[in-house]
Amino acid sequence: MATFLTNVVSIKPTIFSFQSESFTPLHTRVNVFSSKPFPSLAGTFSRSSRTRFIPYAVTETEEKPAALDPSSEAARRVYIGNIPRTVTNEQLTKLVEEHGAVEKVQVMYDKYSGRSRRFGFATMKSVEDANAVVEKLNGNTVEGREIKVNITEKPIASSPDLSVLQSEDSAFVDSPYKVYVGNLAKTVTKEMLENLFSEKGKVVSAKVSRVPGTSKSTGFGFVTFSSEEDVEAAIVALNNSLLEGQKIRVNKA
């Protein structure tokens, strides 16, 4: 007889061996995602060995996300952007610890090229220290570059928040001095484009194109500059260069 289940997430048959007096679980499981009746496997033996399938069901449970604790790491974590590529973890730590107690600092590097991605994070020991770092360092110049410093406010998600991406798109400043950037890796953000292209000229704005209504990258973007000279310099220097492990295409938009 078929058996019906309610709110079943998966059916996980577990194989037990009857070769000894005690059952020995072999840990073979099969996930079944279906609301339809499933045939009972109990009492089924294979011909080659005395193996029995004993199905059991796992019911669904809901977990509510915990509210962000002001003292959590996310509230104490500071984003530091537009830093020179030469800045190391040690140098960034020295810069930050002048304004508060530091728990850890990490400069982010491209996993393929090994080059700095021009930004990093500093986790402070208190929210007050994190706020002090933002107040004292945001807008400061480090080796000729104006750095951007702000509280991350929430843990870095595996996929960007859609409302944030839509806001970024609406904030894009168009210009006749614009380049198209193609063959972008799915992980590339507008900040990465800004950091990369600012090496070759004054970047006005940048954006990564997204599939409408989603956070999924379409694999291309745009960068605007303040002059035609900057456009030409960016194309010559960055066309076919590596970004997040992929060769990008750069040409006039």
Curated annotation (Swiss-Prot):
Disruption phenotype: No detectable effects on ribosome biogenesis and translation in normal conditions. Better seedling growth under salt stress conditions. This is Small ribosomal subunit protein cS22. One of its GO terms (biological process) is response to water deprivation. One of its GO terms (molecular function) is mRNA binding. It holds the Pfam family RRM_1. It comes from Arabidopsis thaliana (Mouse-ear cress). PANTHER family: OS02G0815200 PROTEIN, SMALL RIBOSOMAL SUBUNIT PROTEIN CS22. Expressed constitutively in roots, stems, flower buds, flowers and leaves. GO terms for cellular component: chloroplast; chloroplast envelope; chloroplast stroma; chloroplast thylakoid membrane; cytosol; ribonucleoprotein complex; ribosome; thylakoid. Its main location: plastid. Residues 1-56 form a transit peptide. It is found in: Plastid, Chloroplast. Component of the chloroplast ribosome (chloro-ribosome), a dedicated translation machinery responsible for the synthesis of chloroplast genome-encoded proteins, including proteins of the transcription and translation machinery and components of the photosynthetic apparatus. May have a role in the recruitment of stored chloroplast mRNAs for active protein synthesis. Bind single strand DNA (ssDNA) and RNA in vitro. Exhibits RNA chaperone activity. Negatively regulates resistance responses to abiotic stresses during seed germination (e.g. Induction: Down-regulated under cold, salt and dehydration stress conditions. CDD domains: RRM1_PSRP2_like, RRM2_PSRP2.
